Amino acid sequence: MRIATSTLLVGAASAAFAPQDGTQRVLNGFDSIKSAAHSIQKPLQTFEEAMASMTSEAKANWDHLKLLVPDAEEQAKTFFPKKPKPASRKPDSAWDHIVKGADIQAMWVEGATPEETHRKIDGKLDNYNLRARSVDPSKLGVDTVKQYSGYLDDEANDKHLFYWFFESRNDPKNDPVVLWLNGGPGCSSLTGLLFELGPGAINAKIEIVHNPYAWNNNASVIFLDQPVNVGYSYSGGSVSNTVAAGKDIYALLTLFFHQFPEYAKQDFHIAGESYAGHYIPVFASEILSHKKRNINLKSVLIGNGLTDGLTQYEYYRPMACGEGGWKAVLSESECQAMDNALPRCQSMIQNCYDSGSVWSCVPASIYCNNAMIGPYQRTGRNVYDIRGPCKDSGNLCYPELGYISEYLNRREVMEALGAEVSSYDSCNFDINRNFLFQGDWMQPYHRLVPELLNQIPVLIYAGDADFICNWLGNQGWTEALEWKGKKDYNRADYSPLTLASAHDVKPYGKVKSSGNFTFMKIFEAGHMVPYDQAEPSVDFVNRWLAGEWFAA
């Protein structure tokens, strides 16, 4: 659903280890980021083995971390992933459609000469299959539109990603298609469906409540549980970094649009929030790297995302101390302590950016999360909405997540959707911790955005009351980003955002746009903008999908 904070304050022995031989740098370009990710995919074998590689400089960092987190060593020893939850694969006869990636990979287009003959669709797809079934709207009552659910299967690696597709309520033959991704990492996109922007929500009586401001009012939407072992998705193994998840997304979309070509000709967009600020630049880059594809990617949208940690972490102190438009929630001494910690935090993040090494990126995550987020978190306030306290710590401050979990764990719901796991959880904190301990948290995926801007429009929007991925940091990184349109973007003026229906002239936000880059600040909204500002969110999304702020 969002940046999950239960593991923000963990200690890590890997915070102080020497770089492995052959560590790849995450600098510029998608290929270098893929190489760097490969170097961090193997988890630590034992705590003691990792400690043996500690350098004197790393030892100093580790000693500092132990002062900050006294039980860090014990927490590090218990990091290693637990067994996946039980699952039972349904027979092929339970599905209406099965698409084999090997069949798509075998499709060729004959040219006038042998040199001009080429595969119809790029990418290694032979290990992937897609299963789909029609969902009877009358059984669940979430919406009356055509729906499909199913799994993308990576047969070679025992990975199975669950998705739920809703057709547009308006004109599905022509309306765009949107892929929605929640963050975490490790939180189910079905919470986005049933809590934020989907056609229905779950109330305290575990009943469906119609959402008149659903994003599928004017777009067909795919809600995807990813990476594996999130929501209804499952695997015998795990995914611990964003790049590894990117190939699964490309395969899912390729096979889905092959099975359902009636949606393939429409414009396609990727949208998400929170840790999707990591996912989306990588996933979009993966798609665009394949020149022969059946995915008509037109834009990406990131809401209250974690995209550039170096800039984002600079703005935690201002947001908590009264400079983000809301009153201070920390004392002067606490604010000063955050100021004092910032230079070290930024130095560690920069080291992660420069090296791309897990041994640099993990300590940056641990130190900065403790020093820059910890003081706020210890107040008991909602990290996703600075305006109030955390109402339900067992459900990431929102009781509605508990309602959703109860609904999605009902046998009749799981059967209607074809879910193959034994139970549903809104967030898998093993995944969250796994991504953190493999160095993914601080990776500079924002460096992929300039190349995206050369090809497609990018929207960054942020609710102004969020703390964890606050608007100050999101505005800051968009203005710091090095790209060819930087000067014009930074000189662009803000304009008010008002509802297109014009029945209310009071602005619900403000927007600045130049070239392919657009930033929106949404008023009176926390981390989940569609939840706090339902009508405004569907307003700006519909206008964005229609191309209102796209470069001419």
From Swiss-Prot:
Its main location: other. Keywords: Carboxypeptidase, Disulfide bond, Glycoprotein, Hydrolase, Protease, Signal, Vacuole, Zymogen. Its EC number is 3.4.16.5. Vacuolar carboxypeptidase involved in degradation of small peptides. Digests preferentially peptides containing an aliphatic or hydrophobic residue in P1' position, as well as methionine, leucine or phenylalanine in P1 position of ester substrate. GO terms for molecular function: serine-type carboxypeptidase activity. InterPro entries: AB_hydrolase_fold, Peptidase_S10, Propeptide_carboxypepY, Ser_caboxypep_ser_AS. This is Carboxypeptidase Y homolog A. It comes from Pyricularia oryzae (strain 70-15 / ATCC MYA-4617 / FGSC 8958). Gene3D superfamilies: 1.10.287.410, alpha/beta hydrolase. GO terms for biological process: proteolysis. The keyword Disulfide bond applies. It is an enzyme of class 3 (hydrolase). It catalyses: Release of a C-terminal amino acid with broad specificity. Residues 19-133 form a propeptide. The gene is CPYA. The active site is at residues 274, 466, 527. Disulfide bonds join 187-427, 321-335, 345-368, 352-361, 390-397. It comes from the Eukaryota. It is found in: Vacuole.
